[in-house]
Amino acid sequence: MKRLFFTFLCTAFCALYSSASDTIRILCIGNSFSWDAVEQELAPLCEAGNQPIIIGNLYYGGCSLEQHHTFLLKDAAVYSFRYIKDGVRTPHEGYSLRQALLLDQWDYISFQQASHDSGIQSTYEPYLGALIDSVRAYQPNAQFCWMQTWSYSQDAKHPAFPRYQKSQQIMDDSIQSATLALLLRYPELKLIPCGKAITLARQTKLGDTLCRDGYHLNYLYGRYTAACVWYELLTGKDCRRNPYKNADMTPQQRRLTQQAAHRAGKGL
């Protein structure tokens, strides 16, 4: 009886340890675009794919690399920090970047540029390099990522759209060029090509419908597309084989968005 009880305890402990060690922990230093990409659909995708995940998203609306860097230097408690564990999302207001960095041993930490500056290479430095150095001091073992954001809808009313001649194609090309330059400078960054996935999805029967207001992703399949990219790049699993979908999605919407995310993740 004692032997059986001991065996049970060992099995339970090993299962618990395995679950904890297998958990992926990601921290996004972001804004509303990371809100779209990781806060709603990524956790259910991971659950359906048997991948435990903890998600932290530092949200400050429209935040650029320059602003993030300034906030870190000042230890400014200005973020809304959204913490997602076991599929439960818990927001914490008045959070600082330093607090989030010290909260956990993050496996992945992602950076991104504000959408309005995403295709303008001159806005990236020296702020990204300074952020990488500063964050590395807190989390020396984390894998750093770059979340590529997406271009605006063709009819977007965003005040920064004129920077790209109000052209979705010009904005797409500018983002791709900026991303390439960034990866050449920082080859250690893991690319999360959400922007490419949205572009590919727009080239299907879905058309230019991925955004709900011209720049934020729609709730039905826009966010799902970005989350599928994250899912593939974090887990190495094919999102097309993941059974989860938003309840209101049609089979065609699911198929087209999964294909776009998979192609983007594979660089196709």
How does the language model describe each region?
Residues L4-L16:
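Sec-dependent N-terminal signal peptides
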Residues A12, G49, L234-D238:
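A generic secondary-structure signal for well-formed alpha-helical elements
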Residues S18-A20:
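Boundary at the C-terminal end of the N-terminal hydrophobic targeting segment
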Residues D22, L210, G214-L217, Y221-R223, ...:
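Conserved catalytic region of serine esterases and O-acyltransferases that act on ester linkages
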Residues R25, D36-E125:
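Conserved SGNH/GDSL esterase-like catalytic core that processes O-acyl groups on lipids
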Residues G94-L220, E232, R241:
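Alpha-helical cap/lid subdomain in secreted, periplasmic
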